[in-house]
């Protein structure tokens, strides 16, 4: 049975990234409740980020950043296949993690 998608977007790196409904529910219920109602911002961050960095711990994990009015949104994306990447988590932050820049606006 296919997982139900909340959305799928193509990033500036030409990667297809998906977010399932179950994963989004887990993020906003248990990990980062402040993101409730911000799924549109998560999509925008993936489509039109300010910066994309590779994780220091795992270079195949990418961190997408977009500045909002009150903070910075970070969307963490995993997966090896550029056409089958997925949202691991997302959160609000005040700064960027260290890592190699892959793309900048």
What annotation goes with each model-predicted range?
Residues 1-105:
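Ribonuclease/tRNase effector modules and their secretory precursors
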